[in-house]
Amino acid sequence: MMVNDIEYIRQAEATRVQVLSEALPYIQQFAGRTVVVKYGGAAMKDSHLKDQVIRDIVFLSCVGLRPILVHGGGPEINSWLDKLGIEAQFKNGLRVTDAPTMDVVEMVLVGRVNKEIVSLINQAGGLAVGLCGKDGNLITARPQGQEGIGFVGEVSNVNIKILETLASNGYIPVVSSVAADDSGQAYNINADTVAGEIAAALGAEKLILLTDTRGILKDYQDPGTLIPKVDIREARELINSGVVSGGMIPKVTCCVRSLAQGVRAAHIIDGRIPHALLLEIFTDVGIGTMILGSQYS
């Protein structure tokens, strides 16, 4: 073995030790705490990234955190609508969800995407249980109210009992964003919204949104303008001033709403970065934008 090889091995080992020692205080701090992760975007479509997200979720569970995974599934819904000859329509960024589309949304999110994620977590050594808003009356929906969008819903109520029962016994709840109203009518709800409302109802330590952007950027065209940390007041100002715009507005709004209801910190991170969850939670620097509640110390 060459001297250079030995030095390389030493440096690699030193890096591993540094990473592990840096993670320890965070593992101790967050043990027993609930972390709600919204899973979507490229990290759902790329099989390699998907595998890493799954492993990260299992890691969180193994070191004593209580992860709850909320997922979307837009691309797969579009694929199945296409196979069934149903045209996908959007209005003001929302999927127009008529009765046939709602059937497909529920079939894909609850029957396919959810069960695939559950299976992958279980194969990776976790204990996952798949749910939708209908299970255990977890989420009661109400119409979103906008005209011409069909069965698009909002969260009216969250019943956290089933989540607390599962998480406290070492299970990882995996939640799809389909729920019913009081009459039993199914609704399609934005997965960011569901994650935020679940985090708020549980008083979670963290809400983490996996996205296809680095976080909140001062200039959305320049990844180098990442804002690593803001408080809830500054986040509202960024929306009002137009720095936060387009598709980032509902994500930041969702974070602000959850923080206002008691979540301690919300994170918007780039799910395209390998092991983004672990880097954000267990390292000093983090990789995305952390939005702090006013009570966070």
UniProtKB/Swiss-Prot annotation:
Catalytic activity as recorded in UniProt: N-acetyl-L-glutamate + ATP = N-acetyl-L-glutamyl 5-phosphate + ADP
Annotated GO CC locations: cytoplasm
Record flagged with keyword Disulfide bond: no
PANTHER family (UniProt xref): N-ACETYLGLUTAMATE SYNTHASE (PTHR23342), N-ACETYLGLUTAMATE SYNTHASE, MITOCHONDRIAL (PTHR23342:SF0)
This enzyme's EC code(s): 2.7.2.8
Matches recorded under SUPFAM superfamilies: Carbamate kinase-like
Site positions for Transition state stabilizer: 38, 251
Keyword Secreted: no
Protein name (record): Acetylglutamate kinase
Record lineage: Bacteria, Bacillati, Cyanobacteriota, Cyanophyceae, Nostocales
GO biological process, one term: arginine biosynthetic process via ornithine
Binding of substrate, residues: 73-74, 95, 188
Keywords: Amino-acid biosynthesis, Arginine biosynthesis, ATP-binding, Cytoplasm, Kinase, Nucleotide-binding, Transferase
Species this protein is from: Nostoc sp. (strain PCC 7120 / SAG 25.82 / UTEX 2576)
Main localisation: cytoplasm
Location relative to the cell: Cytoplasm
Pathway annotation from the record: Amino-acid biosynthesis; L-arginine biosynthesis; N(2)-acetyl-L-ornithine from L-glutamate: step 2/4
Similarity comment text for this entry: Belongs to the acetylglutamate kinase family. ArgB subfamily.
GO molecular-function terms, A-Z: acetylglutamate kinase activity; ATP binding
General function of this protein: Catalyzes the ATP-dependent phosphorylation of N-acetyl-L-glutamate.
